[in-house]
């Protein structure tokens, strides 16, 4: 898998070059995530409003790597992060999940969160496993899928 990650790093750098935002991508491995960290003065251009362009860049790179490495496409889990945007977003989601769990505990009522991506929902589910008196469940369909946090 190390070889694939190096090729993906090179792909990310080549795409950034073609987009007119040359930058180096550093591979950073955490226990739960693999990031290609990109730092550039053109970060706002790559991130876009609410991370929209960054999500699109991640989507394109994943589609390309699915074609390049069809035998390992399900095991290649990674994200491209520009100027630590994703890292900060993950921390915000974890904080929001913990705050919501505290509210559920206090008021003994379920909370339905706003719609979010499957990745963001997974962060919430994983974060709240540390609360044995709280249950989480994803409900809804498509872009309206959200997490419901309820007391046990």
Q: For the regions a protein language model found, what residue spans apply to each?
A:
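RNA-contacting regions in translation and RNA-metabolism proteins
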Residues: 1-152
């Amino acid at each position: 898998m190390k070889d694939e990650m190096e090729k993906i790093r090179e792909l990310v750098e080549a795409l950034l070059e073609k987009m007119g935002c040359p930058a180096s991508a550093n591979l950073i491995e955490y226990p739960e995530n693999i990031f290609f960290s990109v730092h550039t003065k053109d970060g706002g251009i790559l991130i876009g409003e609410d991370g929209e362009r960054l999500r699109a860049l991640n989507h394109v790179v994943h589609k390309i790597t699915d074609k390049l490495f069809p035998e390992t496409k399900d095991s290649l889990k990674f994200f491209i992060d520009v100027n630590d945007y994703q890292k900060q977003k993950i921390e915000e989601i974890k904080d929001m999940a913990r705050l919501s769990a505290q509210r559920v505990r206090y008021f003994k009522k379920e909370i339905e969160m706003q719609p979010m991506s499957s990745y963001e929902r997974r962060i919430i589910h994983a974060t709240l496993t540390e609360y044995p008196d709280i249950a989480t469940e994803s409900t809804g369909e498509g872009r309206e899928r959200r997490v419901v946090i309820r007391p046990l």
